[in-house]
Amino acid sequence: MFSTEPRSDTAPGSPSCSETKRRKVRRGTHSCWECKRRKVKCSYSNPSDPRCIGCRRRGTKCLSQQDVDEGASVVSAAVDEDRRIGDRMVRVEALIEQLANQVVNRESEKVVGTNDSESDLATSCSPQDTQTLKHLLPQKVNSPSTCIEYAPVSAALHAALPPHEDINLIIKAGLDVSLHRLMTTSLATLSRCIDGFRAGLAEIPSVDTHPTLLARYLLILATCLQAAHPELHAKEIRCLSEPPRLAMRRLVNAATDLVTSKDELLSSVEGLECVMLESLYLANDGNLRRAWLVCRRAMAVAQLLGLHRVDSQQLPCLTFLSQSVDPRFLWFRIVCTDRQLCLMLGLPQGTPDVSMATESALANDSASGRFERKQCVIASRILERNEASGDFTNDDLATVLKLDEELQQAANEMPSSWWLVPNLASSLHDQNKTIWEMLRLIEQMLYFNLLNLLHLPCMLRARQPA
């Protein structure tokens, strides 16, 4: 127990002890100055110990409250020390916050640097387009922690890149064009942009880029290689380190195994774009069933993200895109691709949604875009007709005639010059013109395919069983 006699590190009877001023304390007071200041229990392991357990553990001087001068100085020094510690903690917190902001800024700069092609689209568009699309700017969902988490995946994807010499040869051959922008950008917007279909192969992503962006680059590169002509690009093909077909398969396999098959990497604009690029590659490669499976997966992910809703919100994005991404347009592209594949494979459609052909949607699109949207709705009704069971009736004939009338009416809205057969040979040296002519040819092909699929089942179906 603490007695009323003073306790200190100085032995009793010494000169320094006798010179210490005393003060009267309340009867029963046993705490030293430090324990009183900290409001903790003051106890001794042995009554003869010069210091209490708390002061011995803290390494502080143990003074009785009877020692006025020294006790006051100790308390004052302790208060000053606490204040200094508090100031240091504030400075440390400020430094940590500053360092964290610097790391985030560096990561953002790296990601933006790997996606200059998206910025090119916005800078090449007119100011009116940029102002109209500002409110649809996607959110960014990238952080240093995610980059660190997926560092091994990014390293594996980066290792799958072909040599820089091969990429330069592909660009030199004029193959730096891709249809991937059609997934996120309307024809009306692309028609007002310079080099809107440029693939951006020159902006090679670094090893610490997010894996979804690396996979996107690999898939775009694979679709560009699909356009390589064995005769027109024979010189460049011979100089490549590996044949284009082997390179395409290797690039797509890497992107599929490491990204598009991982659900956690698909909840963004770029993630959905990767899945649709894989479906596009498979369809162009003749693997329609696999392309349908991949497209249906993209539709399921889009529905989980709420893209099928009329009031769908902005999608999260991995980069600071200057171009905007309309979630409703991305949903329209997924649905349109699904219906075209279902028509060719005889499969039911994934959704009966026809909101892509509302008056507001048609008014904000170009002539080709309106034609494409109307065809998408007619394709949905053809698929519904094909799924209906039972024998062919007069009502079915009336439905076919009505759909034929709507299809012809949509076709008549296009100018007569649009229906001329595109001359791709005359535009070989103009990449932008070539891609637009090819798009016109594809739309014509889809129209006549719809016309055939509308009437052939009626012509081939027997009225009575054989």
Swiss-Prot record:
GO cellular component terms given for this protein: nucleus
Keyword Nucleus in annotation: yes
GO MF assignments: DNA binding; DNA-binding transcription factor activity, RNA polymerase II-specific; zinc ion binding
Keyword hit for Transcription regulation: yes
GO terms, biological process: DNA-templated transcription
Compartments in which it is found: Nucleus
A Pfam family assignment: Zn_clus
Positions with biased composition (Polar residues): 1-18
Chief location: nucleus
UniProt entry keywords in alphabetical sequence: DNA-binding, Metal-binding, Nucleus, Transcription, Transcription regulation, Zinc
DNA-binding region: 32-62
Descriptive protein name: Transcription factor eupR
Encoding gene per record: eupR
